[in-house]
Amino acid sequence: MTTEKPTGSKSRTSRLFYGWWVALAGAMNMIVSSGPTFQAASTLFRAIEDEFGWSRAVVTGVASFGRFGGALLGPLEGWLTDKFGTGKMVVAGFTIGGAGLIFYSQLQGPVQYYAAYFIISLGFSIGGFVPSMAAVNAWMPHKRATAMAIVIGGSSLGGVFVPAIVWGINNHGWRDTTFVIGLITIAAGPPLAYIAGKRAPEYSDLMKQVAKPYDDDETPKYQHDFTAKQALRTRAFWSISISHALTNLSVGAVSAHIFFQLTDPNGVNLSDTSAATIIPIMALSSFSFQLIGGFIGDRMSKRAIVPILILLQGVSLVLLSAAVGYFGALLFAVIWGLGFGGRTPMLHAMRGDYFGRKHFGVILGMSAFPMALGMMATPVIVGRVYDNTGSYDSSLFTLAGFCIIAAVTILLATKPATPK
């Protein structure tokens, strides 16, 4: 998975198992790589709309265009991670993403706007989620769901910095704000790559070094590492991928449009300042339930719990549609965090439990392809519906319906038999 020489289970400066440091580095990676383009995306979109006066579909459609690169590169970046290692992918991706943010700060028209966002998304796709998860999957087979929850939690924690980004936009302008974020991104790449880029020991050696044996009944003590071709032939791969893609339809829409829904007069109708506090609450709620979900996922059947959490994600969308005032928005934020936050690490951990470590990067990349396609489509479709109707209600109810379908689909994801 990674390129450095193997290290022992304990770091030289700490008695903490090194895999936890890899998970923490992955969390920091996600804070940087997802903060400006995922958690804070709608605040930047509002600033762009205010300055240029473009339609809602044009402004938010950039999220779809940016994810197009991620969709195309999903399988490739997984293969590259397995071949070259997490460290090299993080340095390359953060350099590209940071340069894209600097370019973004200088844009003057829609062509530059879309090109800059594509570069940003491309960089963070290469150096962000897939390599971080591949490293954690290699290091932490004994506590896979918990470790993955820490990494994914970093994405949620990126939302904690939304008020700071809003403050920067209001006081220094969106151009200076994105320029500084770009510099921070480039600087963050090498240290994160150094920590996460150390190669995990062989599976048998790793299991001798961990403090405790497996306590997850779904995870065998010795796993078969499925190849990508073998994984594609299983019902579990497609059930997990389809379910994950359906649930992420609403994730793409919410990340692009939440600030608009919270501040629009025909939406929740909050002030910009009040709305900026809801997004960190969403982030903290998601982060908390991601950790709880990871902890539970290492001890109970993930396949039994995930459908309930997916349904709660759908319920939160209905609550957002009905929300009037701050309390309604707050209720949405908490329930969204419970559903979205809790189910996310479990879905990813199921892949590791079912398909092993060796080819996890490319298997995750192939799964990310339909997820990225869904997240690519919904921002622009929801924006177009809003431009035509002046409301997000029909879109939110439709996305809730997709969550119901996903809750049924994941039940089909039984553990595949070991290929002969």
What are the residue ranges of the model-derived segments?
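Extracytoplasmic
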Residues: 21-56, 73, 77, 162, ...
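Extracytoplasmic gate region of multi-pass secondary transporters
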Residues: 37-45, 229-288, 295, 378
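Hydrophobic core of transmembrane alpha-helices in multi-pass small-molecule transporters
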Residues: 31, 100, 112-127, 328-341
